Regions:
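HIT superfamily nucleotide-processing domains
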Residues: 1-135
Length: 135
């Protein structure tokens, strides 16, 4: 059964896209822990990251790192946190979260952004990503 992420990949559902290549896509989480909270996912539908081939896992981590570097250029934060949980959506996804405290990684407090804020943020992070990955 297709997950919501598969529907984003197939463009049945829109997203605030940050980056994309032939294997992965990154987009803003619409229920973010902090401004810039992004999800990086493989385009193949795999439930658990342990089920990814080692090469695909390594490529996902590399892609996620590139996305995190772009986010760090745009969002003021102390660090970029990363988490693989996968309990809510049965599709491997890496949370890339700008953090200033441990609380930002707890998935309890959420922030609200409107469409205009999400759209502007996605464009800004995408520009930073594109600039860094155009070499």
């Amino acid at each position: 059964m297709a997950s919501i992420f598969s529907k984003i990949i197939s463009k049945e559902i829109p997203c605030y896209k940050i980056a994309e290549n032939k294997e992965f896509i990154a987009f803003l989480d619409i229920n973010p822990n902090s401004t810039g909270h992004t999800l990086c996912i493989p385009k193949i539908e795999v439930d658990d990251f342990l089920d990814l081939e080692k090469e695909s896992y390594n490529k996902l981590m590399s892609f996620s790192r590139d996305v995190a570097l772009a986010i760090k250029k745009v969002i003021p934060c102390k660090r970029i946190g990363m988490s693989l949980i996968g309990l809510e959506v049965p599709h491997v996804h890496v949370h890339i979260i700008p953090i200033s405290s441990m609380e930002d990684m707890q998935f309890v407090k959420k922030i609200k952004l409107n469409h205009k804020q999400f759209d502007s943020l996605a464009k800004e992070i995408n520009a930073a990503y594109s600039l860094s990955n155009s070499i």
